[in-house]
């Protein structure tokens, strides 16, 4: 819904990047594979998303040149389910519009991202983004920098490895 809204209402302010967005939607496995192989060979570039800009090798290249990014988790409402998506935006100095874990504020301060749940529709969200002053924008970036430098240890590779190791030891010992 978000992609379609931006395509209709703010096409110059939105770009969609990534693999397979140029192929038709999900289809049953074998039939879908056949349809997708045909689509790839068509003499014209089929794409059901006009905002699709293509495949990129490094998402940071795009994120660094964008003020905001839509960061929707594949699963909404699952407590603690926070993926790399929001950190990709942080690493690029980009302000994420986040929708995912209901308890996101238990892990990441609310002044580091724009919570999509705070807007009743796409129009409200878009107006908020367009009306954001440079001072507000820079404040988000300062808060992100502070979080990354001082509070993000829970999301490091070392912490992840420690959690996995402890769980394995727990399983072995029981």
Put a short name on every predicted segment.
Residues 122-174:
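C-terminal amphipathic helix plus adjacent low-complexity
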Residues 1-114, 136, 151-152, 163-173:
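Nucleotide-sugar donor-binding catalytic core of glycosyltransferases
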């Amino acid at each position: 819904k978000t992609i379609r809204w931006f395509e209709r209402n703010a096409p110059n302010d939105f770009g969609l990047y990534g693999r397979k967005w140029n192929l038709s939607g999900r289809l049953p496995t074998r039939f879908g594979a056949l349809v997708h192989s045909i689509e790839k060979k068509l003499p014209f570039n089929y794409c059901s998303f006009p905002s699709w800009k293509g495949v990129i090798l490094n998402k940071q290249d795009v994120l660094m040149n964008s003020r905001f990014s839509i960061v929707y988790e594949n699963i909404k409402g699952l407590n603690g389910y926070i993926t790399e998506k929001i950190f990709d935006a942080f690493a690029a100095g980009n302000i994420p519009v986040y929708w995912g874990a209901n308890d996101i504020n238990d892990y990441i301060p609310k002044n580091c991202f724009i919570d999509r749940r705070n807007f009743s529709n796409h129009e409200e969200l878009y107006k908020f983004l367009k009306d954001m002053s440079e001072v507000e924008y820079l404040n988000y970036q300062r808060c992100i920098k502070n979080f990354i430098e001082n509070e993000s240890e829970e999301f490091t590779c070392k912490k992840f490895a420690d959690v996995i190791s402890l769980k394995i030891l727990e399983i072995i010992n029981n």
